[in-house]
């Protein structure tokens, strides 16, 4: 990341109250703070740009604002996280000053600053439309687990490759590493605007992976390799683990 990128980047954190496995997830207490505030704090530690939380409930709006972070109310009926991010972008930056949009998921309260910064690195190449992250798989079970999204790509360097496909299947075939995709994205503003204007694609619907819409439309996604998968909080057990991690850091 260079200074020019940092000055033109906007970090958007979507926070959705309607979680089936963990109702009220953004407000879940982690070490005395709502989870969404912990995520905003982690994003602030990365020092990559202005931070805005895209919320869909007044209680979350109040929690974020009370903690000193910027919140924007968005619709509750968005079909995807990208649509919510786009609405928040238009409201937060109507003048179009932010050239890069970083989407940090609102259920990553323990994420380190490093991966957030790493997501910007592929955008140093002006040909890259979207950047994202991945980790080499070391657990054999993950290779066949459809809930672990794999990314298949063409190497650009030891730490980066160009995405050719994302899949829930075990791929690619043969000897060599497999990679676990991390759903943290950095978009060029124009790429996000193009993406949300497209209809869901055939492969996107088949795999239930919206990033395939971008690939099918000919957009370029480059992937930075990082060391570990951040904990996503989806269940009460995940929440307990996040509490232990942040308590140990205190």
Curated annotation (Swiss-Prot):
Signal sequence extent: none
Keyword Coiled coil attributed: no
CDD domains on file: CMP-KDO-Synthetase
EC number(s) per entry: 2.7.7.38
Tagged with keyword Nucleotidyltransferase: yes
Location in the cell: Cytoplasm
Stored InterPro entries: Cytidylyl_trans, KdsB, Nucleotide-diphossugar_trans
BP terms from Gene Ontology: CMP-keto-3-deoxy-D-manno-octulosonic acid biosynthetic process; lipopolysaccharide biosynthetic process
GO cellular component, one term: cytosol
Record field: transmembrane: none
UniProt main location, coarse: cytoplasm
Reactions performed catalytically: 3-deoxy-alpha-D-manno-oct-2-ulosonate + CTP = CMP-3-deoxy-beta-D-manno-octulosonate + diphosphate
Pathway given in the UniProt record: Nucleotide-sugar biosynthesis; CMP-3-deoxy-D-manno-octulosonate biosynthesis; CMP-3-deoxy-D-manno-octulosonate from 3-deoxy-D-manno-octulosonate and CTP: step 1/1; Bacterial outer membrane biogenesis; lipopolysaccharide biosynthesis
Recorded GO MF terms: 3-deoxy-manno-octulosonate cytidylyltransferase activity
Keywords: Cytoplasm, Lipopolysaccharide biosynthesis, Nucleotidyltransferase, Transferase
The protein's role, per its UniProt record: Activates KDO (a required 8-carbon sugar) for incorporation into bacterial lipopolysaccharide in Gram-negative bacteria.
Family as reported in the entry's similarity comment: Belongs to the KdsB family.
PANTHER family linked: 3-DEOXY-MANNO-OCTULOSONATE CYTIDYLYLTRANSFERASE, 3-DEOXY-MANNO-OCTULOSONATE CYTIDYLYLTRANSFERASE, MITOCHONDRIAL
Protein name per the record: 3-deoxy-manno-octulosonate cytidylyltransferase
Gene: kdsB
